[in-house]
């Protein structure tokens, strides 16, 4: 059911990619400017790194997120979120944390980081939904497709890229416990 590159909601690149620098593993589509994780270079799959000038596989969709807070945890704390899925302005968002976004408790760095991950995934899903509607109406572009080996997957895989250990552990280790507590 799952993908071999994802275990406990944590993405890792295929071991065949170990020789590549991270800058080569994060790809950007020249047509839509969105960010993606490189597919495996096994020649049998014809992955992104196997052939020069190959079209970018749009399966592993990346959302880069960050959250920040000044006066962390105090009454006068100010916090904000930043998310991007590509270079175009339409793919970059910043949100001020206000009561409408986070009505409970004081503003904190950790809360801002987690909300950035949630909002980033929402934005990514919204963009994909709009593109699917456009495609269904004959307005969409045809380059947004996964490599051959992903054609049986019903959905693309969304990957949150964060510099926050709290977010990474929250998604990969603590999420099952949080889900049980909230249900």
Can you name each region flagged by the protein language model?
Residues 4-5, 14-115, 122-130:
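RNase H-like nuclease fold core
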Residues 69-72, 118-183:
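RNase H catalytic domain
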